[in-house]
Amino acid sequence: MKKELVFIIDFGGQYSQLIARRVRENNVYCEIIPYSTSIEKIKEKNPKGIIFSGGPNSVYGENSPRISKEIFEIDVPVLGICYGQQLASFILGGKVESAKVREYGKTAVNLDNKCALFEGIDKVQECWMSHTDYVSEIPSGFNIVAYTDGCKVAAMANEDKKIYGVQFHPEVEHTPFGKKMLKNFLFNICELKGDWSVTSFAEEKIKEIRELVGDKKVICALSGGVDSSVAAVIVHKAIGDQLTCIFVDHGLLRKDEGDQVESIFKEKFQMNLIRVNAQDRFLGKLKGVTEPERKRKIIGEEFIRVFEEEANKLGKIDYLVQGTIYPDVVESGTDTSATIKSHHNVGGLPEDIEFELIEPLRELFKDEVRRVGEELGIPHKLVWRQPFPGPGLGIRVLGEVTEEKLEIVREADAIFREEIANAGLDEKIWQYFACLPNIRSVGVMGDERTYSHTIGLRAVNSSDGMTSDWAKIPYEVLDKVSIRIVNEVKGVNRIVYDITSKPPSTIEWE
Protein backbone atom coordinates (compact mmCIF):
# COMPACT_ATOMS: atom_id res chain seq x y z
CA MET A 1 0.00 0.00 0.00
CA LYS A 2 1.36 3.40 -0.97
CA LYS A 3 1.71 5.57 2.13
CA GLU A 4 0.70 9.21 2.48
CA LEU A 5 3.65 11.59 2.39
CA VAL A 6 4.40 15.03 3.80
CA PHE A 7 7.55 16.88 2.75
CA ILE A 8 9.43 19.08 5.20
CA ILE A 9 11.58 21.43 3.16
CA ASP A 10 14.73 22.25 5.10
CA PHE A 11 15.93 25.86 5.05
CA GLY A 12 18.56 25.26 7.73
CA GLY A 13 16.36 25.40 10.80
CA GLN A 14 17.66 23.76 13.96
CA TYR A 15 14.23 22.18 14.52
CA SER A 16 13.67 20.55 11.11
CA GLN A 17 14.00 17.03 12.54
CA LEU A 18 11.77 17.97 15.46
CA ILE A 19 9.05 19.03 13.01
CA ALA A 20 9.43 15.60 11.39
CA ARG A 21 9.06 13.90 14.74
CA ARG A 22 5.87 15.83 15.51
CA VAL A 23 4.43 14.79 12.14
CA ARG A 24 5.36 11.14 12.72
CA GLU A 25 3.69 11.20 16.14
CA ASN A 26 0.44 11.50 14.20
CA ASN A 27 1.21 8.32 12.21
CA VAL A 28 1.94 10.39 9.13
CA TYR A 29 5.07 9.58 7.15
CA CYS A 30 7.28 12.52 6.27
CA GLU A 31 10.63 13.13 4.64
CA ILE A 32 12.99 16.05 5.06
CA ILE A 33 14.30 17.33 1.74
CA PRO A 34 16.71 20.19 0.93
CA TYR A 35 15.30 23.48 -0.34
CA SER A 36 17.23 22.90 -3.58
CA THR A 37 15.03 19.90 -4.51
CA SER A 38 13.43 20.52 -7.91
CA ILE A 39 9.67 21.05 -8.24
CA GLU A 40 9.62 18.12 -10.68
CA LYS A 41 11.05 15.75 -8.06
CA ILE A 42 8.56 17.01 -5.48
CA LYS A 43 5.66 16.45 -7.88
CA GLU A 44 6.88 12.92 -8.67
CA LYS A 45 6.50 11.89 -5.03
CA ASN A 46 2.95 13.30 -4.85
CA PRO A 47 3.08 14.76 -1.32
CA LYS A 48 -0.19 15.49 0.46
CA GLY A 49 1.28 18.39 2.42
CA ILE A 50 4.41 20.57 2.53
CA ILE A 51 6.00 22.26 5.54
CA PHE A 52 8.70 24.94 5.23
CA SER A 53 11.16 24.78 8.15
CA GLY A 54 12.65 27.75 9.93
CA GLY A 55 16.18 28.93 9.24
CA PRO A 56 18.85 31.38 10.40
CA ASN A 57 18.87 33.53 7.24
CA SER A 58 17.09 36.67 6.09
CA VAL A 59 15.01 36.44 2.91
CA TYR A 60 16.94 39.46 1.64
CA GLY A 61 20.34 37.83 2.15
CA GLU A 62 22.40 37.31 -1.00
CA ASN A 63 22.87 33.59 -0.37
CA SER A 64 19.71 32.93 1.60
CA PRO A 65 17.91 29.67 0.73
CA ARG A 66 14.98 30.13 -1.66
CA ILE A 67 12.44 27.98 -3.46
CA SER A 68 10.53 28.42 -6.70
CA LYS A 69 7.13 30.12 -6.66
CA GLU A 70 5.84 27.00 -8.45
CA ILE A 71 5.70 25.23 -5.08
CA PHE A 72 2.49 27.18 -4.40
CA GLU A 73 0.96 26.15 -7.72
CA ILE A 74 0.93 22.34 -7.33
CA ASP A 75 -2.31 22.31 -5.34
CA VAL A 76 -0.81 20.96 -2.11
CA PRO A 77 -1.35 22.61 1.31
CA VAL A 78 1.70 24.52 2.56
CA LEU A 79 2.64 25.55 6.11
CA GLY A 80 5.58 27.91 6.60
CA ILE A 81 7.24 28.10 10.02
CA CYS A 82 9.29 31.15 11.12
CA TYR A 83 11.68 31.74 8.16
CA GLY A 84 9.23 29.57 6.22
CA GLN A 85 6.45 32.12 6.75
CA GLN A 86 8.74 35.01 5.84
CA LEU A 87 9.86 33.25 2.66
CA ALA A 88 6.28 32.42 1.63
CA SER A 89 5.27 36.06 2.13
CA PHE A 90 8.32 37.32 0.23
CA ILE A 91 7.76 34.98 -2.75
CA LEU A 92 4.03 35.74 -2.96
CA GLY A 93 4.39 39.53 -2.92
CA GLY A 94 4.29 40.45 0.76
CA LYS A 95 6.92 42.44 2.64
CA VAL A 96 9.45 41.31 5.24
CA GLU A 97 11.36 43.70 7.48
CA SER A 98 14.00 43.49 10.18
CA ALA A 99 12.76 44.22 13.69
CA LYS A 100 14.50 46.78 15.90
CA VAL A 101 14.33 44.30 18.79
CA ARG A 102 14.58 40.54 18.34
CA GLU A 103 11.55 38.61 19.65
CA TYR A 104 12.86 35.58 21.51
CA GLY A 105 11.30 33.27 24.10
CA LYS A 106 7.82 32.65 25.44
CA THR A 107 5.25 35.09 24.11
CA ALA A 108 1.48 35.52 24.47
CA VAL A 109 -0.28 35.12 21.12
CA ASN A 110 -3.85 35.93 20.06
CA LEU A 111 -5.35 33.45 17.59
CA ASP A 112 -8.30 33.59 15.21
CA ASN A 113 -9.74 30.16 15.93
CA LYS A 114 -12.18 30.44 13.05
CA CYS A 115 -9.14 29.67 10.89
CA ALA A 116 -8.84 25.94 10.14
CA LEU A 117 -5.27 25.95 11.46
CA PHE A 118 -6.41 26.99 14.95
CA GLU A 119 -9.73 25.16 15.11
CA GLY A 120 -10.51 23.90 18.63
CA ILE A 121 -7.76 26.04 20.23
CA ASP A 122 -8.50 28.82 22.72
CA LYS A 123 -7.87 32.32 21.39
CA VAL A 124 -5.15 33.39 23.84
CA GLN A 125 -2.15 31.07 24.03
CA GLU A 126 1.55 30.98 24.80
CA CYS A 127 4.04 30.35 21.99
CA TRP A 128 7.80 30.24 21.40
CA MET A 129 9.27 33.00 19.24
CA SER A 130 12.80 33.17 17.87
CA HIS A 131 13.15 35.74 15.08
CA THR A 132 14.57 39.09 14.03
CA ASP A 133 12.81 39.52 10.68
CA TYR A 134 9.02 39.62 10.46
CA VAL A 135 6.24 39.89 7.88
CA SER A 136 5.22 43.55 7.77
CA GLU A 137 2.76 43.27 4.88
CA ILE A 138 0.90 40.10 3.92
CA PRO A 139 0.49 38.99 0.29
CA SER A 140 -2.75 39.54 -1.61
CA GLY A 141 -5.42 36.95 -0.73
CA PHE A 142 -4.08 36.37 2.81
CA ASN A 143 -5.53 37.28 6.20
CA ILE A 144 -3.76 37.86 9.50
CA VAL A 145 -4.90 35.03 11.82
CA ALA A 146 -2.64 35.57 14.84
CA TYR A 147 -0.70 38.44 16.44
CA THR A 148 1.45 39.23 19.47
CA ASP A 149 2.39 42.55 21.07
CA GLY A 150 5.67 42.51 19.16
CA CYS A 151 4.58 40.85 15.92
CA LYS A 152 1.46 41.93 14.07
CA VAL A 153 1.64 38.93 11.70
CA ALA A 154 2.24 36.01 14.05
CA ALA A 155 0.30 33.88 11.55
CA MET A 156 -1.24 34.38 8.12
CA ALA A 157 -3.57 32.29 5.98
CA ASN A 158 -4.92 32.00 2.46
CA GLU A 159 -7.63 29.45 3.23
CA ASP A 160 -8.80 29.15 -0.38
CA LYS A 161 -5.34 28.03 -1.54
CA LYS A 162 -4.54 26.28 1.76
CA ILE A 163 -1.33 28.25 2.31
CA TYR A 164 -0.49 29.09 5.91
CA GLY A 165 2.38 30.66 7.79
CA VAL A 166 3.28 31.04 11.47
CA GLN A 167 6.08 33.16 12.90
CA PHE A 168 6.32 31.06 16.08
CA HIS A 169 7.55 27.47 16.48
CA PRO A 170 4.64 25.00 16.93
CA GLU A 171 7.01 22.02 17.04
CA VAL A 172 8.69 22.86 20.38
CA GLU A 173 7.34 22.01 23.83
CA HIS A 174 7.27 25.72 24.72
CA THR A 175 4.29 26.16 22.34
CA PRO A 176 1.69 24.04 24.21
CA PHE A 177 -0.97 24.24 21.48
CA GLY A 178 1.56 23.45 18.73
CA LYS A 179 0.78 19.73 18.54
CA LYS A 180 -2.93 20.43 18.13
CA MET A 181 -2.17 23.04 15.46
CA LEU A 182 -0.01 20.60 13.49
CA LYS A 183 -2.72 17.96 13.84
CA ASN A 184 -5.21 20.44 12.36
CA PHE A 185 -2.87 21.04 9.42
CA LEU A 186 -2.33 17.33 8.78
CA PHE A 187 -5.88 16.04 9.19
CA ASN A 188 -8.24 18.98 8.62
CA ILE A 189 -6.30 20.86 5.95
CA CYS A 190 -4.24 18.13 4.21
CA GLU A 191 -7.03 15.57 4.87
CA LEU A 192 -4.58 12.80 5.75
CA LYS A 193 -5.62 9.50 7.32
CA GLY A 194 -2.49 8.69 9.34
CA ASP A 195 -1.53 5.33 7.81
CA TRP A 196 2.15 5.10 8.87
CA SER A 197 3.48 3.11 11.83
CA VAL A 198 6.74 1.58 13.02
CA THR A 199 5.31 -1.83 12.09
CA SER A 200 4.77 -0.78 8.49
CA PHE A 201 8.19 0.93 8.51
CA ALA A 202 9.96 -2.28 9.56
CA GLU A 203 8.08 -4.39 7.01
CA GLU A 204 8.86 -1.98 4.17
CA LYS A 205 12.50 -1.60 5.21
CA ILE A 206 13.00 -5.39 5.30
CA LYS A 207 11.49 -5.69 1.82
CA GLU A 208 13.58 -2.76 0.54
CA ILE A 209 16.84 -4.23 1.88
CA ARG A 210 16.04 -7.69 0.47
CA GLU A 211 15.49 -6.17 -2.99
CA LEU A 212 18.57 -3.95 -2.75
CA VAL A 213 20.98 -6.64 -1.60
CA GLY A 214 19.81 -9.56 -3.74
CA ASP A 215 22.35 -12.35 -3.30
CA LYS A 216 25.22 -10.08 -2.23
CA LYS A 217 27.03 -10.18 1.11
CA VAL A 218 26.68 -7.64 3.90
CA ILE A 219 28.59 -6.86 7.08
CA CYS A 220 27.18 -4.92 10.01
CA ALA A 221 28.97 -2.53 12.32
CA LEU A 222 27.63 -4.07 15.52
CA SER A 223 28.33 -2.30 18.81
CA GLY A 224 25.60 -3.84 20.97
CA GLY A 225 23.91 -0.48 21.43
CA VAL A 226 20.22 -0.02 20.60
CA ASP A 227 20.76 1.52 17.17
CA SER A 228 23.22 -0.98 15.71
CA SER A 229 21.31 -3.88 17.29
CA VAL A 230 17.98 -2.91 15.72
CA ALA A 231 19.72 -2.21 12.40
CA ALA A 232 21.36 -5.65 12.51
CA VAL A 233 18.11 -7.47 13.28
CA ILE A 234 16.25 -5.67 10.46
CA VAL A 235 18.94 -6.63 7.96
CA HIS A 236 19.17 -10.19 9.33
CA LYS A 237 15.40 -10.62 8.90
CA ALA A 238 15.80 -9.42 5.32
CA ILE A 239 18.76 -11.52 4.18
CA GLY A 240 19.59 -14.08 6.90
CA ASP A 241 23.04 -15.66 6.66
CA GLN A 242 24.15 -13.24 3.95
CA LEU A 243 24.79 -10.90 6.89
CA THR A 244 27.95 -11.18 8.97
CA CYS A 245 28.11 -8.99 12.07
CA ILE A 246 31.53 -7.61 12.88
CA PHE A 247 31.85 -6.61 16.53
CA VAL A 248 34.92 -4.43 16.94
CA ASP A 249 35.95 -4.48 20.58
CA HIS A 250 38.00 -1.30 20.55
CA GLY A 251 38.62 -1.38 24.29
CA LEU A 252 36.37 1.65 24.75
CA LEU A 253 33.28 -0.26 25.93
CA ARG A 254 31.50 -0.24 29.27
CA LYS A 255 32.18 -2.89 31.91
CA ASP A 256 31.55 -6.48 30.68
CA GLU A 257 29.85 -5.14 27.55
CA GLY A 258 31.89 -7.09 25.04
CA ASP A 259 30.98 -10.46 26.53
CA GLN A 260 27.29 -9.50 26.75
CA VAL A 261 27.16 -8.49 23.08
CA GLU A 262 28.78 -11.72 21.96
CA SER A 263 26.37 -13.82 24.03
CA ILE A 264 23.16 -12.04 22.91
CA PHE A 265 23.78 -12.08 19.17
CA LYS A 266 25.34 -15.51 18.88
CA GLU A 267 22.89 -17.34 21.16
CA LYS A 268 19.64 -15.34 20.97
CA PHE A 269 19.71 -14.34 17.30
CA GLN A 270 21.94 -17.07 15.85
CA MET A 271 23.82 -14.49 13.79
CA ASN A 272 27.18 -14.88 12.13
CA LEU A 273 29.28 -12.84 14.57
CA ILE A 274 33.01 -12.11 14.47
CA ARG A 275 34.51 -10.41 17.53
CA VAL A 276 37.73 -8.51 16.89
CA ASN A 277 39.88 -7.53 19.86
CA ALA A 278 41.47 -4.27 18.73
CA GLN A 279 42.09 -2.37 21.98
CA ASP A 280 45.86 -2.02 21.53
CA ARG A 281 45.42 -0.80 17.98
CA PHE A 282 42.92 1.92 18.94
CA LEU A 283 44.85 3.10 22.00
CA GLY A 284 47.99 3.28 19.88
CA LYS A 285 46.26 5.56 17.38
CA LEU A 286 44.81 7.72 20.18
CA LYS A 287 48.09 8.16 22.05
CA GLY A 288 48.83 11.83 22.62
CA VAL A 289 45.55 12.98 20.99
CA THR A 290 43.50 15.40 23.12
CA GLU A 291 41.25 17.27 20.68
CA PRO A 292 37.72 15.76 20.72
CA GLU A 293 36.99 16.07 17.00
CA ARG A 294 40.32 14.45 16.18
CA LYS A 295 39.56 11.56 18.55
CA ARG A 296 36.18 10.99 16.89
CA LYS A 297 37.72 10.99 13.43
CA ILE A 298 40.49 8.59 14.46
CA ILE A 299 38.04 6.18 16.09
CA GLY A 300 35.67 6.34 13.12
CA GLU A 301 38.42 5.80 10.57
CA GLU A 302 40.11 2.99 12.49
CA PHE A 303 36.72 1.34 12.97
CA ILE A 304 36.21 1.20 9.21
CA ARG A 305 39.75 0.00 8.57
CA VAL A 306 39.20 -2.97 10.89
CA PHE A 307 36.04 -3.73 8.93
CA GLU A 308 37.89 -3.65 5.65
CA GLU A 309 40.47 -6.11 6.96
CA GLU A 310 37.76 -8.49 8.18
CA ALA A 311 35.88 -8.12 4.90
CA ASN A 312 38.97 -9.13 2.96
CA LYS A 313 39.07 -12.35 4.97
CA LEU A 314 35.42 -13.02 4.12
CA GLY A 315 35.77 -12.52 0.38
CA LYS A 316 33.64 -10.16 -1.69
CA ILE A 317 31.53 -7.88 0.56
CA ASP A 318 29.30 -5.23 -0.98
CA TYR A 319 27.45 -3.48 1.85
CA LEU A 320 28.10 -2.13 5.33
CA VAL A 321 25.23 -1.65 7.80
CA GLN A 322 25.35 1.27 10.23
CA GLY A 323 22.92 2.26 12.98
CA THR A 324 22.76 5.94 12.01
CA ILE A 325 19.60 7.70 13.29
CA TYR A 326 18.17 11.20 12.74
CA PRO A 327 19.86 13.03 15.64
CA ASP A 328 23.22 11.67 14.41
CA VAL A 329 22.61 13.39 11.10
CA VAL A 330 21.41 16.74 12.45
CA GLU A 331 24.32 17.01 14.92
CA SER A 332 26.72 16.65 12.02
CA GLY A 333 25.16 19.64 10.25
CA THR A 334 23.59 20.06 6.82
CA ASP A 335 24.15 22.37 3.86
CA THR A 336 22.29 25.14 5.64
CA SER A 337 23.19 24.69 9.30
CA ALA A 338 26.43 24.90 11.20
CA THR A 339 28.17 21.72 12.36
CA ILE A 340 27.76 21.17 16.09
CA LYS A 341 29.98 18.10 16.31
CA SER A 342 30.80 15.44 13.77
CA HIS A 343 28.95 12.26 14.65
CA HIS A 344 30.76 8.93 14.71
CA ASN A 345 28.27 7.37 12.29
CA VAL A 346 28.52 10.08 9.67
CA GLY A 347 31.60 12.20 10.30
CA GLY A 348 34.31 9.60 10.76
CA LEU A 349 33.93 7.75 7.48
CA PRO A 350 37.04 7.88 5.27
CA GLU A 351 36.52 9.17 1.73
CA ASP A 352 37.90 5.93 0.28
CA ILE A 353 35.43 3.63 2.07
CA GLU A 354 35.16 0.35 0.16
CA PHE A 355 31.54 -0.53 0.97
CA GLU A 356 28.18 0.92 0.06
CA LEU A 357 26.25 1.95 3.17
CA ILE A 358 22.92 0.57 4.37
CA GLU A 359 21.46 2.79 7.10
CA PRO A 360 17.99 1.36 7.83
CA LEU A 361 17.31 3.67 10.79
CA ARG A 362 18.55 6.93 9.30
CA GLU A 363 15.04 8.43 9.25
CA LEU A 364 14.07 7.44 12.81
CA PHE A 365 14.33 9.08 16.21
CA LYS A 366 15.51 7.10 19.23
CA ASP A 367 12.01 6.44 20.61
CA GLU A 368 10.93 5.15 17.18
CA VAL A 369 13.99 2.90 17.00
CA ARG A 370 13.04 1.34 20.35
CA ARG A 371 9.47 0.73 19.14
CA VAL A 372 10.78 -0.92 15.97
CA GLY A 373 13.07 -3.07 18.12
CA GLU A 374 10.18 -4.28 20.23
CA GLU A 375 8.14 -5.00 17.10
CA LEU A 376 11.03 -7.16 15.86
CA GLY A 377 11.09 -9.19 19.09
CA ILE A 378 14.37 -7.88 20.46
CA PRO A 379 14.54 -8.44 24.26
CA HIS A 380 13.23 -5.52 26.31
CA LYS A 381 16.49 -5.20 28.23
CA LEU A 382 18.45 -4.66 25.02
CA VAL A 383 15.91 -2.32 23.42
CA TRP A 384 15.96 -0.06 26.49
CA ARG A 385 19.71 -0.16 26.85
CA GLN A 386 21.41 3.15 27.55
CA PRO A 387 22.35 5.20 24.47
CA PHE A 388 26.08 4.82 23.92
CA PRO A 389 28.17 6.71 21.34
CA GLY A 390 30.19 4.83 18.75
CA PRO A 391 33.50 6.27 20.03
CA GLY A 392 32.47 4.84 23.40
CA LEU A 393 34.49 5.80 26.46
CA GLY A 394 36.95 7.45 24.09
CA ILE A 395 34.86 10.62 24.31
CA ARG A 396 33.95 10.11 27.97
CA VAL A 397 37.62 10.35 28.86
CA LEU A 398 38.33 14.01 28.19
CA GLY A 399 41.80 14.69 26.88
CA GLU A 400 44.23 11.86 26.11
CA VAL A 401 42.80 8.33 26.36
CA THR A 402 44.88 5.84 28.36
CA GLU A 403 44.21 2.36 29.69
CA GLU A 404 44.35 3.67 33.28
CA LYS A 405 41.79 6.41 32.60
CA LEU A 406 39.50 3.98 30.79
CA GLU A 407 39.52 1.65 33.79
CA ILE A 408 38.63 4.54 36.13
CA VAL A 409 35.67 5.77 34.08
CA ARG A 410 34.52 2.20 33.35
CA GLU A 411 34.31 1.32 37.06
CA ALA A 412 32.71 4.66 38.01
CA ASP A 413 30.12 4.29 35.25
CA ALA A 414 29.26 0.74 36.36
CA ILE A 415 28.63 1.95 39.93
CA PHE A 416 26.48 4.85 38.71
CA ARG A 417 24.36 2.57 36.51
CA GLU A 418 24.03 -0.02 39.27
CA GLU A 419 22.76 2.52 41.82
CA ILE A 420 20.35 4.08 39.32
CA ALA A 421 18.91 0.59 38.74
CA ASN A 422 18.77 -0.12 42.50
CA ALA A 423 16.72 3.07 42.91
CA GLY A 424 14.26 1.93 40.20
CA LEU A 425 15.21 4.83 37.94
CA ASP A 426 16.89 2.89 35.14
CA GLU A 427 13.91 3.17 32.76
CA LYS A 428 12.75 6.56 34.02
CA ILE A 429 15.93 8.44 33.11
CA TRP A 430 16.65 8.56 29.38
CA GLN A 431 20.45 8.51 29.60
CA TYR A 432 22.97 8.51 32.42
CA PHE A 433 26.72 7.93 32.53
CA ALA A 434 30.01 8.85 34.14
CA CYS A 435 32.80 10.72 32.40
CA LEU A 436 36.35 11.61 33.33
CA PRO A 437 37.12 15.32 32.88
CA ASN A 438 40.76 16.14 32.44
CA ILE A 439 40.81 17.56 35.97
CA ARG A 440 42.65 16.64 39.14
CA SER A 441 41.89 18.26 42.47
CA VAL A 442 43.19 18.26 46.03
CA GLY A 443 41.47 16.08 48.62
CA VAL A 444 42.04 14.41 51.98
CA MET A 445 41.70 10.64 52.40
CA GLY A 446 42.91 8.76 55.48
CA ASP A 447 44.52 11.90 56.94
CA GLU A 448 46.64 12.24 53.82
CA ARG A 449 46.56 14.83 51.07
CA THR A 450 45.47 13.49 47.68
CA TYR A 451 45.67 14.95 44.21
CA SER A 452 43.33 12.75 42.20
CA HIS A 453 40.83 12.58 39.37
CA THR A 454 37.35 14.10 39.29
CA ILE A 455 34.39 12.08 37.97
CA GLY A 456 31.53 13.88 36.22
CA LEU A 457 28.05 12.35 36.40
CA ARG A 458 25.56 13.15 33.61
CA ALA A 459 21.87 12.18 33.54
CA VAL A 460 19.27 13.62 31.18
CA ASN A 461 15.65 13.12 30.17
CA SER A 462 14.66 13.29 26.51
CA SER A 463 12.50 11.44 24.03
CA ASP A 464 14.50 12.01 20.86
CA GLY A 465 18.00 13.28 21.70
CA MET A 466 17.31 16.61 19.98
CA THR A 467 16.72 18.45 23.26
CA SER A 468 17.06 17.26 26.86
CA ASP A 469 16.74 18.38 30.47
CA TRP A 470 19.06 17.32 33.28
CA ALA A 471 17.52 14.66 35.49
CA LYS A 472 16.55 15.55 39.06
CA ILE A 473 18.03 12.47 40.73
CA PRO A 474 17.23 12.26 44.48
CA TYR A 475 20.07 13.53 46.65
CA GLU A 476 20.27 10.27 48.59
CA VAL A 477 20.94 8.36 45.34
CA LEU A 478 23.65 10.81 44.28
CA ASP A 479 25.14 10.59 47.77
CA LYS A 480 25.33 6.80 47.58
CA VAL A 481 26.91 6.95 44.10
CA SER A 482 29.48 9.50 45.26
CA ILE A 483 30.47 7.53 48.36
CA ARG A 484 30.84 4.29 46.42
CA ILE A 485 32.91 5.75 43.58
CA VAL A 486 35.33 7.56 45.90
CA ASN A 487 35.77 4.44 48.03
CA GLU A 488 35.79 1.78 45.31
CA VAL A 489 37.54 3.43 42.36
CA LYS A 490 41.23 4.02 42.83
CA GLY A 491 42.48 7.46 41.85
CA VAL A 492 39.22 9.43 42.35
CA ASN A 493 38.57 11.94 45.13
CA ARG A 494 35.81 14.20 43.80
CA ILE A 495 32.39 13.74 42.14
CA VAL A 496 30.44 16.48 40.30
CA TYR A 497 26.92 16.35 38.82
CA ASP A 498 26.19 18.10 35.50
CA ILE A 499 23.04 20.27 35.72
CA THR A 500 22.98 21.77 32.22
CA SER A 501 20.34 20.98 29.61
CA LYS A 502 20.62 20.57 25.83
CA PRO A 503 20.85 23.25 24.53
CA PRO A 504 23.13 24.96 25.50
CA SER A 505 25.17 21.82 26.22
CA THR A 506 25.27 18.62 24.20
CA ILE A 507 24.54 15.40 26.09
CA GLU A 508 28.10 14.08 25.80
CA TRP A 509 30.92 16.21 27.17
CA GLU A 510 32.98 15.71 24.00
Curated annotation (Swiss-Prot):
Keyword annotations of the record: ATP-binding, Glutamine amidotransferase, GMP biosynthesis, Ligase, Nucleotide-binding, Purine biosynthesis
CDD domains: GATase1_GMP_Synthase, GMP_synthase_C
Keyword ATP-binding carried by entry: yes
Superkingdom of origin organism: Bacteria
Pathway listed: Purine metabolism; GMP biosynthesis; GMP from XMP (L-Gln route): step 1/1
The keyword ATP-binding appears for this protein: yes
Chemical reaction(s) catalysed: XMP + L-glutamine + ATP + H2O = GMP + L-glutamate + AMP + diphosphate + 2 H(+)
Molecular-function annotations in GO: ATP binding; GMP synthase activity
EC number: 6.3.5.2
One GO location term (cellular component): cytosol
Residue ranges of every copy of the GMPS ATP-PPase domain listed in the record: 196-385
List of residues binding ATP: 223-229
InterPro entries linked to this entry: Class_I_gatase-like, GATASE, GMP_synth_C, GMP_synth_GATase, GMP_synthase, GMPS_ATP_PPase_dom, NAD/GMP_synthase, Rossmann-like_a/b/a_fold
Pfam families referenced in this protein's UniProt entry, alphabetically: GATase, GMP_synt_C, NAD_synthase
Database matches in SUPFAM superfamilies: Adenine nucleotide alpha hydrolases-like, Class I glutamine amidotransferase-like
Glutamine amidotransferase type-1 domain ranges (all copies): 5-195
Annotated catalytic residues: 82, 169, 171
Purpose: Catalyzes the synthesis of GMP from XMP.
HAMAP family in the record: GMP_synthase
Quaternary assembly: Homodimer.
Name listed for the protein in its UniProt record: GMP synthase [glutamine-hydrolyzing]
Organism taxonomic ancestry: Bacteria, Bacillati, Bacillota, Clostridia, Eubacteriales
